[in-house]
């Protein structure tokens, strides 16, 4: 029985990091993060004229597009005050790609929530409760290791990390834009570096909590 239970336990350990990372990313990818970032004293101003209110308006609209079920026309129909479209064709193509990644990430997140919750509900089965919480504990430790490595990479060379991250999900070069393009004006590198840092800190916090919780509960079970 223990050998059989080690298989789902191993699976739980592996999915905990993905669950925590996606949860933290979803928390950060919210309008309140844009409110916080755009209003930071040291946040870089847009050299091409966007005010903080402009950035909040268009930034939140763009974020909404990524998480809603609307088609590309949700953004492509938007015009800037000078009559030009909010995003040019290359930018819109990238936003469509980003939405696909985000929507896939949401589906994966929901599945992970369901798997972890179902496994937790099944802890009434003889012998499984200890295996489950031990797996959660190990998943927390694994997450801590991964996040420390990511935070180190961010601290040492964020530009390289950022490029590698995009190359993982998008066609080479499709995510590179001019400084005058709307995407760069709305979402400068400062916003991304802070976002990755906050996501890492939230994930690390969740991992520590789960590892402590799993450790305590697994040891209380005889």
Where would I find each of the regions flagged by the language model?
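Juxtamembrane non-transmembrane "cap" segments at the membrane-aqueous interface
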Residues: 155-179
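Individual transmembrane alpha-helix segments
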Residues: 68-111, 190-200
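Hydrophobic alpha-helical transmembrane segments
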Residues: 46-59, 81-91, 106-120, 137-156, 201-206, 221-222
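Terminal transmembrane helical module of multi-pass membrane proteins
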Residues: 174-222
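Alpha-helical transmembrane signal-anchor/signal-peptide segments
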Residues: 26-47, 167
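Hydrophobic secretory-pathway targeting helix
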Residues: 1-34
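Juxtamembrane interface at the cytosolic side of transmembrane helices
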Residues: 2-11, 113-160, 209-222
């Amino acid at each position: 029985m223990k050998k059989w239970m080690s298989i789902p336990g191993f699976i739980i350990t592996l999915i905990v990091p993905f669950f925590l990372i996606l949860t933290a990313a979803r928390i950060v990818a919210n309008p309140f993060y844009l409110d916080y970032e755009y209003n930071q004293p040291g946040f870089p101003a847009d050299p091409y004229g966007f005010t903080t209110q402009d950035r909040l308006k268009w930034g939140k609209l763009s974020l909404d597009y990524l998480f809603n079920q609307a088609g590309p026309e949700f953004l492509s129909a938007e015009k800037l005050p000078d009559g030009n479209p909010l995003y040019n064709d290359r930018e819109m193509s990238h936003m469509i790609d980003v939405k696909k990644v985000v929507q896939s990430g949401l589906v994966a997140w929901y599945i992970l929530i369901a798997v972890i919750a179902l496994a937790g509900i099944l802890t009434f089965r003889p012998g499984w409760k200890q295996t489950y919480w031990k797996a959660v504990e190990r998943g927390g430790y694994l997450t801590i290791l991964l996040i420390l490595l990511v935070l180190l990479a961010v601290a040492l060379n964020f530009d390289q990390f950022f490029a590698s991250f995009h190359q993982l999900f998008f066609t080479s070069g499709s995510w590179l834009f001019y400084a005058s393009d709307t995407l760069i004006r709305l979402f400068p590198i400062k916003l991304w570096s802070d976002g990755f840092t906050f996501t890492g800190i939230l994930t690390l916090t969740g991992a520590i909590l789960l590892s402590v919780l799993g450790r305590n509960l697994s040891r209380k079970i005889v």
